[in-house]
């Protein structure tokens, strides 16, 4: 028998037939008012936040650096949406104040992404961790020429030199009062005359009840994974939800009732845009 001659393989680039149904649920969700979701949104307790984190690491096999990267990127994106680089004076300067824990790691990731977004971040990281993860995050910033401050200037100099401050000092595991070595830092941040963006929890706040009249009052808050109970008392201009990594089954288990993120965005504005 003669071997049949092989025909060259051809690829078709024709348009999809009009009769094919396309799922537009995500696009539709972006158009739906956020208000209807806020009524059901679950503001989690400190205990719930800890359990959710533990399950992300164990049941869902996330690593700390994975979640930190996604969280820090969402914070940087929320900053860019709230305070666009274009019209920003002072060369787009931003001061990122990092604490010794995972919240500080989120801040380091945020600083790196802000640099990539065209801002000029500086980092104040007074109590650096000796863990490899944090040392790597620090080196990544340094290799991208993000300067690290050896001390925190007074409030007026910070206000004159920077456009805004990212507060990455303490996260949802914090329990008042503030440790003595951070009292001076907190006092200076409370007195700055530029916007403060807090990551997950305004530093110094009780995770359940919030802060008092003497507490840090950020203009922008980026809640991660799910908003914490204290954020009900947030009165600033921008409240974002970030950290788009919660598996649907986990969200259902804790009845988080998270609103759908628009399109491919990694952060979602929970408050109406200021006029």
UniProtKB/Swiss-Prot annotation:
GO terms for molecular function: metal ion binding; NAD(P)HX epimerase activity; nucleotide binding. Its EC number is 5.1.99.6. Its cofactor is K(+). Keywords: Isomerase, Metal-binding, NAD, NADP, Nucleotide-binding, Potassium. It comes from the Eukaryota. (6S)-NADPHX binds at residues 102-106, 171-177, 200. Disulfide bonds: none annotated. The keyword Isomerase applies. Pfam families: YjeF_N (PF03853). Residues 49-258 form the YjeF N-terminal domain. PROSITE patterns: YJEF_N (PS51385). One of its GO terms (cellular component) is mitochondrion. It is an enzyme of class 5 (isomerase). Binds 1 potassium ion per subunit. It catalyses: (6R)-NADHX = (6S)-NADHX; (6R)-NADPHX = (6S)-NADPHX. K(+) binds at residues 103, 167, 203. Catalyzes the epimerization of the S- and R-forms of NAD(P)HX, a damaged form of NAD(P)H that is a result of enzymatic or heat-dependent hydration. This is a prerequisite for the S-specific NAD(P)H-hydrate dehydratase to allow the repair of both epimers of NAD(P)HX. Belongs to the NnrE/AIBP family. This is NAD(P)H-hydrate epimerase. It comes from Ixodes scapularis.
């Amino acid at each position: 028998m003669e071997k049949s001659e092989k025909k060259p393989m051809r690829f078709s680039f024709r348009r999809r037939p009009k009769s094919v149904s396309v799922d537009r649920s995500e696009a539709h969700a972006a158009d739906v008012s956020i208000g209807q979701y806020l009524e059901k949104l679950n503001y989690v307790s400190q205990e719930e936040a800890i359990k959710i984190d533990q399950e992300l690491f164990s049941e869902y096999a996330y690593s700390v650096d994975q979640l930190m990267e996604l969280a820090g990127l969402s914070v940087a994106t929320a900053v860019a949406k709230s305070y666009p680089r274009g019209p920003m004076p002072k060369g787009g300067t931003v001061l990122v104040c990092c604490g010794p824990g995972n919240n500080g790691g989120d801040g380091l990731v945020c600083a790196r992404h802000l640099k990539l977004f065209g801002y000029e971040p500086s980092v104040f990281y007074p109590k650096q961790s000796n863990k490899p993860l944090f040392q790597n995050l620090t080196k990544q910033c340094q290799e991208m020429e993000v300067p690290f401050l050896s001390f925190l200037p007074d409030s007026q100099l910070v206000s004159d030199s920077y456009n805004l401050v990212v507060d990455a000092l303490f996260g949802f595991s914090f329990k008042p009062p503030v440790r003595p070595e951070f009292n001076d830092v907190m006092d200076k941040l409370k007195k700055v005359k530029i916007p403060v963006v807090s990551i997950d929890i305004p530093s110094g706040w009780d995770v359940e009840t919030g802060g008092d009249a003497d507490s840090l009052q950020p203009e922008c808050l980026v809640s991660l994974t799910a908003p914490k109970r204290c954020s009900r008392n947030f009165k600033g201009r921008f409240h974002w939800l970030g950290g788009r990594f919660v598996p649907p089954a986990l969200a259902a288990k804790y009845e988080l009732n998270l609103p759908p993120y628009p399109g491919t965005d990694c952060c979602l504005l929970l408050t109406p845009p200021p006029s």
